Amino acid sequence: MKKIKSFGGKSLGGGKQEKLLKDFMKMQEELQKKMQEMEESFSEMEVEASVGGGAVRIVATCDRRVKEIEIDEDLKEDLETLKDLLAAAVNEIMEKIEKRREEEMSKITQQFGIPGLM
């Protein structure tokens, strides 16, 4: 088998190269499996955002699905305030979802020695 130079300039014999490739493929498969499991778990992970002192509250899952919206009865009379608070709550929930997803992704990438992937 032909020797191939690695990135460090050293020659890798055929056996070493094959083992490295097999190890890499196995790690890639494990990483893909973990990532798929994580994606599936996002439908169960909930985050909550509350704005206006609790006047508007949103609960959503980390797969970006809104489960619940609560609006204080007093906001019925003030449509402009309601729209502002609703926009703020949606923005906050999206930020929280992304942060949670990044935290979960970081847990997996650290297991595989891939810091800063997300």
Swiss-Prot record:
Keywords for the protein's UniProt record, in alphabetical order: Cytoplasm, DNA-binding
Pfam families per record: YbaB_DNA_bd (PF02575)
Coiled-coil intervals: none
Family matches, as Gene3D superfamilies: Nucleoid-associated protein YbaB-like domain (3.30.1310.10)
Subcellular location: Cytoplasm, Nucleoid
Protein role: Binds to DNA and alters its conformation. May be involved in regulation of gene expression, nucleoid organization and DNA protection.
Record-stated family: Belongs to the YbaB/EbfC family.
Stated name of the protein: Nucleoid-associated protein CTN_1899
Organism: Thermotoga neapolitana (strain ATCC 49049 / DSM 4359 / NBRC 107923 / NS-E)
